[in-house]
């Protein structure tokens, strides 16, 4: 160790070591600052790149929402199911036809009852006197409401067409198309104006290069400091030590250049950070423009949803009309069935009247025949009594059969009445 000391001045070694240590500390501080800047830049770049996927997601959501509103809500639910099927076919055709049919039925039934003469008493002239004639108007109110319902459906068709045109000509053809074009122009991977390309490619390459350069600078300065430390400790053979000393002295001459490169790289990193931030700021401006266009579409969709309340109100109106018609039709059906049975019952009643009259006549005939037979028998009885008295009266005292022997009163009394059956 003493030989090495005589060969290599220790103060010179100390000078080299101290210089290497100072340069390493300063370089570490500068590189750490630059690396922090680069780390922040990378984070901001990653965050900005994620925003592109968010924008794509928002665009797809809006496209799907518009398509859903146009194809499902408007065309399928409102146009096909509600207007064409529920209203136009079921209500305006089937229900209206049923209402008209049953109105005609009950009117016909009423006329039949009016034309059916009542023959049992003089208090009424026809069977219609026994029913409420107001029933003929049960469905008339619904018939009177048909033009109103038809007009409402016509209005709603026009309203539907207006909304559909608004969706197709303004929302889809203008606003949504403008948003697509804006996205493709500024955020599509194939667009020349896509600033995300810088974040995804060029800037990433630059950032990696800066990180590699700083790592190389630190590696070189650290390696030089490690050599100085070995030289300072003087634990290797003298020939190796001398060789190391020459290497260290040579590297020392490059140390200032490396430090200058570290400093310049730090300036470049700051400039790079500024450039990236400016690009990100420009991207954020573009994103702001996207959100502005998207918000207009959202506002338009909200208006369209409000328009649906009009369909709901008309739907409720038509539903109430339909349900009311169904109930009235059921009521009229029951009345028509009752009127048929009422007329049939009246015909059967006339038959019953005739049957009772025939029965009364038959009873009267039987009773008259009976009366005639009884009278004949009574006459024969009187003749025989008189003959008995002529033959035996003079010989029999009256007290032998008191009250009967000379009694000439008929042995029967016959009274009857038959209930009158009116014509």
From Swiss-Prot:
Main location: cytoplasm
GO CC list: Atg1/ULK1 kinase complex; phagophore assembly site membrane
Superkingdom, taxonomy of origin: Eukaryota
Gene Ontology MF, one: molecular adaptor activity
Keywords: Autophagy, Cytoplasm, Membrane
Compartment(s): Cytoplasm; Preautophagosomal structure membrane
InterPro entries for this protein: Atg17, ATG17-like_dom
Any one of the GO BP annotations: autophagy of mitochondrion
Bilayer topology term: Peripheral membrane protein
Family of the protein in this entry: Belongs to the ATG17 family.
Physiological role: Autophagy-specific protein that functions in response to autophagy-inducing signals as a scaffold to recruit other ATG proteins to organize pre-autophagosomal structure (PAS) formation. Modulates the timing and magnitude of the autophagy response, such as the size of the sequestering vesicles. Plays particularly a role in pexophagy and nucleophagy.
Protein name: Autophagy-related protein 17
Gene that this sequence comes from: ATG17
């Amino acid at each position: 160790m003493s030989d090495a000391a005589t060969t290599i001045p220790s103060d010179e070694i100390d000078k080299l070591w101290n210089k290497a240590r100072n340069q390493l500390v300063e370089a570490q501080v500068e590189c750490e600052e630059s690396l922090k800047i680069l780390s922040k830049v990378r984070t901001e770049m990653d965050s900005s790149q994620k925003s592109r996927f968010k924008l794509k997601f928002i665009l797809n959501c809006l496209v799907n929402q518009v398509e859903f509103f146009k194809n499902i809500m408007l065309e399928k639910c409102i146009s096909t199911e509600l207007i064409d099927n529920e209203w136009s076919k079921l209500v305006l055709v089937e229900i209206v036809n049923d209402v008209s049919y049953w109105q005609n039925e009950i009117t016909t039934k009423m006329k039949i009852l009016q034309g059916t003469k009542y023959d049992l008493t003089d208090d009424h002239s026809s069977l219609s006197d026994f029913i409420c004639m107001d029933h003929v108007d049960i469905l008339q109110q619904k018939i009177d409401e048909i033009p109103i319902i038809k007009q409402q459906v016509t209005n709603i068709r026009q309203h539907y067409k207006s909304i559909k045109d608004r969706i197709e000509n303004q929302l889809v053809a203008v606003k949504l198309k403008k948003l697509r074009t804006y996205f493709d122009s500024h955020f599509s991977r194939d667009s020349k104006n896509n600033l995300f390309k810088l974040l995804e490619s060029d800037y990433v390459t630059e950032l990696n290069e800066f990180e590699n350069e700083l790592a190389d600078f630190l590696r070189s300065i650290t390696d030089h400091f490690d050599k100085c430390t070995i030289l300072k400790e003087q634990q290797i053979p003298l020939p190796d030590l001398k060789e190391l000393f020459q290497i260290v002295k040579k590297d020392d001459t490059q140390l200032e250049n490396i430090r200058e490169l570290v400093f310049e790289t730090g300036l470049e990193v700051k400039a790079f950070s500024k450039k990236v931030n400016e690009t990100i700021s420009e991207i954020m401006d573009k994103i702001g423009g996207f959100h502005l266009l998207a918000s207009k579409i959202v506002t338009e969709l909200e208006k369209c949803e409000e328009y649906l309340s009009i369909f709901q109100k008309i739907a409720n109106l038509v539903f109430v009309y339909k349900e009311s018609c169904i109930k009235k039709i059921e009521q009229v059906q029951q009345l028509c069935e009752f009127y048929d049975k009422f007329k049939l019952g009246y015909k059967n009643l006339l038959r019953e009247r005739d049957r009772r009259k025939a029965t009364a006549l038959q009873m009267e005939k039987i009773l008259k025949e009976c009366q005639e037979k009884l009278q004949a028998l009574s006459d024969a009885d009187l003749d025989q009594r008189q003959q008995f008295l002529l033959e035996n009266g003079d010989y029999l005292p009256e007290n032998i059969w008191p009250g009967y022997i000379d009694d000439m009163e008929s042995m029967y009394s016959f009274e009857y009445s038959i209930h009158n059956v009116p014509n």
